[in-house]
Amino acid sequence: MANTTGRIPLWIIGTVAGIVVIGLIGLFFYGSYSGLGSSL
């Protein structure tokens, strides 16, 4: 991890991307389950 100076580490990008994807999927399923999926 000594070569990540000035750049974002790849594991941070992967973690953030994973959280965002899981959050979007969760909101989509929660919205469709609550009957609000059409408003998205």
From Swiss-Prot:
- Homology family: Belongs to the PsbJ family.
**Quaternary structure, from the entry:** PSII is composed of 1 copy each of membrane proteins PsbA, PsbB, PsbC, PsbD, PsbE, PsbF, PsbH, PsbI, PsbJ, PsbK, PsbL, PsbM, PsbT, PsbX, PsbY, PsbZ, Psb30/Ycf12, at least 3 peripheral proteins of the oxygen-evolving complex and a large number of cofactors. It forms dimeric complexes.
The function of this protein is: One of the components of the core complex of photosystem II (PSII). PSII is a light-driven water:plastoquinone oxidoreductase that uses light energy to abstract electrons from H(2)O, generating O(2) and a proton gradient subsequently used for ATP formation. It consists of a core antenna complex that captures photons, and an electron transfer chain that converts photonic excitation into a charge separation.
Q: Where are the annotated coiled coils located? A: none
Q: Which Pfam families match?
A: PsbJ
Q: What membrane topology does the UniProt entry give?
A: Single-pass membrane protein
The cellular location(s) given in this protein's UniProt record come to: Plastid, Chloroplast thylakoid membrane
Major localisation = plastid
Gene name per UniProt: psbJ
Question: Biological process GO terms, please?
Answer: photosynthesis
User: Know the name of this protein?
Assistant: Photosystem II reaction center protein J
Is the keyword Heme in the record?
A: no
Provide the transmembrane region boundaries: 8-28
